[in-house]
Amino acid sequence: MHVKTSNEISIMLEGGKILAEVLSNLLSKVRPGVSELELDTLAEKLIKEKGAEPGFKRVKGYKHTICVSTNDVVVHGVPTEYRLKVGDIIGIDCGVYYKGFNTDMAETVKISNIKYQTSKRDDEIDKFLKTGKRALEEGIKVARLGNRVGHISKKIQDIVEGAGYSVVRSLVGHGVGKSLHEEPEVPGYLNERIEQTPLLVEGLTIAVEVIYNMGKKDVIYANNDGWSIKSKDSSLSGLFERTIAITKDGPLVLTQV
């Protein structure tokens, strides 16, 4: 595990603020008719204007600034010309590289149109997305000094599965810092005793992720782009993520929207 100094955490907080502002801007542009690639282009423009670099473009072989999870895409969706329509959901996952450090965050939203009446499906999607947001918030709350990764994992799993959804097992949160992916892994589920999971120590920076499906937990690689992962049963998938630091005063969200 790569423990950060207070100065390094301050740098990550600066980068995280840039990332949160960019993602907030992107989410404000999400509406029917907007294409995934348009959002990707805007993301790169905004990040560079703020003096940072697109973190995901530093990943070997990946050529975009964001990953998009539209409908049944779970993670790592490559932006395309697909134009969003009412009833879709889209997760935007974005990373920023700033002064030598990465931050990472994601949010999933529904494409709505106030001219249309809400339906039972709308209500189901709203419940699904609210569950993911709550699981992330509650998972972060237990990311305290002296607790373990397993406390985060159990909290996320209990909330997601308690609502009738499934946590994806093959994709997890992670440490983040000078590298986009560092130790430890931070699963959204518990597959061992909490006492056997890594201890949360002061200065640890992690990306807490809630990766879950409305249907079953199984996923498959999709298309031929080598990146996009979808739910195997084509059910909707949600993604919520924040980068946080473990401090003596509690969890510090570095990518606060």
Segments the model singles out, each with a brief description of its role:
Residues 1-257:
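Active-site neighborhoods and metal-handling regions in enzymes and metal-associated proteins
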